[in-house]
């Protein structure tokens, strides 16, 4: 079989487990749809596309090592991922600049890493304009931030804090919890003390669902708006 007859094999890194595992079925369906549409058009450069599923819901180092092993074995030609930023950063440590890498999830901002293509929403195009809109439409002037404790929520929170100050709004504080948190009692107590007009929720997947339900049970939905840029 000649090179042109071989499929283009893509490591498709999506969460199958963990907090972000709730997004897994949607991600896999999108991948299948993309392959079907490309196949109808003759593939890419006349070659079929084959997805190699990599579970991006595990520890970042474990995910990155699997991608690197596939690359070194000649088993993949590119990487496409919808997963958390901590996984992206680790994958880049192993294959950055070596393989085309399309990162489809929302992210912290612009990057200029060779071979990395960011197609998801940046804070300047999504979160920050939404803060302004919520102020205009609902009078949300005071804000708290609740997020998971890793790079994306922390960097978005920092961008939001600076934006709020520049736009004449108030940032009352931020709190971060580990991925997989199930008990948000302390977080809800903290929100009750601050009583913000709105809460920017930077929690992932199942964590966001559990927080939202606990927030409503506490009756905080009668006091504060919630805005989340990522919720299944």
Model-based region annotation:
Residues 120-176:
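An alpha-beta-alpha
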Residues 41-57, 113-115, 164-184:
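Short beta-strand elements in bilobed, periplasmic/extracellular small-molecule ligand-binding domains
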Residues 24-44:
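Short, polar/charged alpha-helical segment
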Residues 161-163, 167-232:
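Extracellular/periplasmic bilobed ligand-binding domains
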Residues 87-89, 127, 153, 184, ...:
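Short, well-ordered alpha-helical microsegments
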Residues 3-7, 11-30, 60:
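Extracytoplasmic "Venus flytrap"
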Residues 27, 44-109:
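Beta-alpha junction/loop-to-helix N-cap segments that form part of ligand/metal-binding clefts
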Residues 99-130:
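Extracellular glycoside hydrolase catalytic/binding regions
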């Amino acid at each position: 079989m000649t090179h042109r007859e071989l499929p283009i094999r893509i490591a498709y890194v999506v969460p199958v487990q963990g907090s972000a595992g709730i997004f897994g079925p949607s991600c896999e369906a999108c991948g299948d749809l993309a392959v079907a549409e490309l196949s109808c058009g003759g593939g890419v450069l006349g070659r079929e596309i084959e997805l190699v599923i990599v579970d991006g819901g595990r520890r970042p180092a474990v995910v990155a090592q699997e991608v690197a092993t596939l690359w070194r074995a000649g088993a993949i030609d590119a990487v496409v991922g919808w997963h958390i930023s901590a996984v992206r950063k680790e994958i880049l440590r192993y294959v950055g600049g070596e393989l085309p890498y399309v990162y489809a999830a929302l992210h912290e901002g612009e990057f200029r890493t060779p071979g990395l293509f960011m197609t998801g929403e940046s804070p300047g195009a999504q979160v920050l304009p939404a803060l302004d809109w919520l102020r205009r439409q609902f009078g949300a002037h005071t804000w708290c931030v609740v997020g998971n404790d890793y790079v994306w929520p922390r960097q978005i929170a920092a961008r939001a804090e600076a934006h709020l100050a520049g736009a004449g709004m108030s940032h009352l504080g931020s709190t971060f919890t580990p991925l997989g948190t199930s008990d948000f009692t302390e977080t809800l107590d903290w929100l009750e003390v601050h009583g913000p007009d709105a809460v920017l929720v930077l929690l992932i997947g199942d964590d966001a669902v559990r927080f939202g339900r606990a927030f409503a049970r506490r009756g905080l939905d009668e006091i504060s708006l919630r805005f989340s840029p990522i919720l299944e």
